[in-house]
């Protein structure tokens, strides 16, 4: 029998424990702080963030996922919310800020319900019901978009690019993105592999200089200046083997006593390299991309044959070259045949921003393309590349799913209206959670108004009134005019998948945090490289 009053120590002294409401409040606070961090970046008039790392490197962006990735975050609940943004980026390529802001608002509404003594399980059930209903309603709100509807696809890309630092050239960028995505669509499945669109970044020119190359651009130069700079009607060999004499695996030693033998040895080495080059030339190849090294002597012989050669090409670039030119990657020079060669109308070395780059262009049916992103400075071109990447993601979603919804907060207001109506049919305290979910969705139009310097209350009232009318589900906030307008007419549209993924991710993250009622945190080991006092996760750290 245990002694009365004697304390039983289960956890070590350096472990902190937060139980029940304390744990929930702490997690909710951490999640809300992450959401507040990116909230001001939402929409076309959202502000940018400047992030400076330990080395003094600067990133200027308003891309939600980039901000969250670059931030050093300690709190485990905050890290879970950052995962929401990463999932959104990976799945659909855009809507990261929307997902995180909705998650933060769901947590804020959940805290209000917890203060009314509503059990977390009830809130979770209500949120799950609301999420399922929202996704169902989204499908009924969505409009169809056909793959051949270029104008609509351009509008989708422009909506994504707006507010991302590349606005002045958004029409041109949208056109480039739509062309690029269309070029790599799999004709059988209708799917798009984003990896087949290479975004090459070079500063030193205005954003308007951004171009689509129907082929591949390699950030390399010719291995020998004697080689031709430009090859028309190129026959391209892709080699995954070095053009040099292979060293043996064994540590063999050759003792030469006669100087003539040494000359024979060197001549034999030369002959082996010359034979390799002869074999390549015999196939009719006049351009060689090699994943490994090219011997100095091999470079000389290739130049004499008028063959343009590039070495140490990345594996990903080799795969894109194969897709663009129709070439096959060969792992042994002896196996190279004319059938393995790819074709391109032009292969040329050009100077871009002072650096030599190899352009492989005029491919007949390229299944890999390159967007050469330009900007006046390194920070501008990085932001342009991020905008292009997001636009590729949304156009890909629209082509694959074929459904779009109105932007500018129109969809969120409509969902909130329908969820409030649905809440009336829900019995029990879950009804309050469904209503809270509906209110949380309105954070998107409210934030769009705030970030544009408009009165959020006035705008919400106008939006709700517009949505009560027949066909009002497409009315959203035009932040440039400060008016409530038809978003489809205005061309502010987003793929359905971006919205469903944002609502799914936000709900799952908030539900996961609400389920936690006990946090047991070990203190960091002293002398840890990030500082020894980081174990405390109390509210004072945030």
From Swiss-Prot:
Q: Does the keyword ATP-binding apply?
A: yes
InterPro entries tied to this protein = Chaperone_TCP-1, Chaperonin_TCP-1_CS, Cpn60/GroEL/TCP-1, GroEL-like_apical_dom_sf, GROEL-like_equatorial_sf, TCP-1-like_intermed_sf, TCP-1_chaperonin, thermosome_alpha
The name on file for this protein is Thermosome subunit
Does the record carry Cell wall biogenesis/degradation as a key word?
Answer: no
Q: Which Gene3D superfamilies match?
A: GroEL, GroEL-like equatorial domain, TCP-1-like chaperonin intermediate domain
Per the UniProt entry, what are the Gene Ontology biological process annotations, in alphabetical order? protein folding
Keywords, in A-Z order: ATP-binding, Chaperone, Nucleotide-binding
State the oligomer form and interacting partners. Answer: Forms an oligomeric complex of eight-membered rings.
Q: What does this protein do?
A: Molecular chaperone; binds unfolded polypeptides in vitro, and has a weak ATPase activity.
- Family (UniProt): Belongs to the TCP-1 chaperonin family.
Superkingdom of origin? Archaea
Which molecular function term from Gene Ontology is one that the record holds? Answer: ATP hydrolysis activity
Q: Which Pfam families does the record associate with it?
A: Cpn60_TCP1
Q: Which organism is it from?
A: Methanocaldococcus jannaschii (strain ATCC 43067 / DSM 2661 / JAL-1 / JCM 10045 / NBRC 100440) (Methanococcus jannaschii)
